[in-house]
Curated annotation (Swiss-Prot):
Name of protein: DNA-binding protein PAE3044
A Gene Ontology term for the protein's cellular component: cytosol
Domain of life of the native organism: Archaea
Any one Pfam family match given in the protein's UniProt record, by short name: dsDNA_bind
Organism: Pyrobaculum aerophilum (strain ATCC 51768 / DSM 7523 / JCM 9630 / CIP 104966 / NBRC 100827 / IM2)
Molecular functions per Gene Ontology: DNA binding
Disulfide cysteine pairs (residue numbers): none
HAMAP family according to UniProt: dsDNA_bind (MF_00026)
Protein keywords: DNA-binding
Amino acid sequence: MSEGSFEDRELEEIRRKKLEELQKKAELERQAQIVAAQRRIALKKILTPEALARLDNIRVVRPELAEALEQQLINLAATGRVRVPIDEETLKKILEAVYSQTRREYRFRL
């Protein structure tokens, strides 16, 4: 009978650990959603509707580029280095700068 209770305790411990993992994962996802919502609110404040639509299009095609661009836009607006609201033309110029920084260059030697 002691073997059965040992297995029960072991099984209960596995369940407890799995539950903790799931709770941690859910909390991380919730925090990520909060950060994304805060970022979206900030972007709505600093971009014109046209610029925001362009950013959304970029996000569909190149999510990593959109994320870098979003961070750059928020930083520029927070430090006052760009006039707010940012219009589509200004967004294009900032996009070119961010793209040139994030683009990977591949060189092949033959």
